[in-house]
Amino acid sequence: MRTLTLLLSLLFLASPIAAQFGSFFDQMFGGGGHGGHGHQHQQQHQGHGQQQHPNVPSDPSIYQANYQRAHCDKYLCPDTLACVHYPHHCPCPWPSHEDKVELAEGQRVCVSRGGFKAGEAARKIELARQGLL
């Protein structure tokens, strides 16, 4: 009876471990516990309507082409390609997640809110500028 309890306990504990680390071993060893068929299985899924898109290349030419096509007779913001009157008017690329802080001489920075309340990032930048942080 004790052996049966021990065996059932081991099986119960092993299933979450297999679920957690199974894909790790599949990726590291090419399908490890599946007789080496993990790669073939992945290729089969790709053929059934689940197309995987390639990663964006590490090549600035896509950005440069968009920059060259953008028409602006004022100031073209380099990070958002927005056309504004002055550089410090440039919007942040992710305004729902960043606070815009205007610095001296028409410069601005976009700072991640990081879970802080509205205006907290700007307050910390101002404290740092004053040497208090």
Curated annotation (Swiss-Prot):
Endpoints of the signal sequence: 1-19
Disulfide bonds: none
Low complexity composition-biased segments: 43-53
UniProt xrefs under InterPro entries: LCL2 (IPR034543)
Annotated keywords: Signal
Keyword Ribosomal protein part of the UniProt annotation: no
Region entry Disordered, spans: 32-60
Gene Ontology BP terms: ERAD pathway
Similarity comment text for this entry: Belongs to the LCL2 family.
Role played: Probable component of the endoplasmic reticulum-associated degradation (ERAD) pathway.
Protein name as annotated: Long chronological lifespan protein 2
Source organism of the structure: Sordaria macrospora (strain ATCC MYA-333 / DSM 997 / K(L3346) / K-hell)
